[in-house]
Amino acid sequence: MLNISLCVDGVWYDAINDLYCIPKKFNVGIAEPKTNYVQVPYRNGSLDMSEALTGITYKNREIAIPLLILHPEPLAVYDLVSNRFNGKKCKIRLFESLESQSEYYYEGRIRVGTLLTNDSKWEFDIFMNAFPFKMRDVLIYVDGATTKSITNEGIDTVPTITVETAMQGTWNGESFTLAVGIHNPHSMVLKTGANTLVVAQGAGKVEFAEKRL
């Protein structure tokens, strides 16, 4: 049995237990690469400039999920879902079964579709215009001298480092010093794969959203 959970304004709602709906199937589109082909006079074919500036970039992906209402008052359920989610920026997690768990989520704007009846069953679709990547939030605390191996299974990203006590150490072998405060140091890129944070002194936390197709 499939299930989903939706997050709006920082609160997660389980489709079955909180919204009285069950997903019939998942329709998750792939993120289409953005391309840029330039026609050059007197040259065979086109010049592919798709990766010239920032590497490969992607368009948003489309997600559509038909929901079957389980509650004896389907109109009330439809009103509940519409008022809580329609038009709002949300996160959504997809579960292959009631027992499965997933830290990954998609994020985008939700649109609630038309309520339909079919053989005494009430159902509607929800649609999301989603950011290209599915994401997973990672939070790592450091306090005093320590070494942390941080694995990033997604694309390269810059972490947010909240420093509570002035911090010194190395990031992938490069020295750094950070004062108390919130930092997004572009010299401390979280590369795809294994990364090593060595803290000689200080305390704080490292946060990032792992992004993968």
Where would I find each of the regions flagged by the language model?
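Extracellular/virion structural assembly segments
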Residues: 1-213
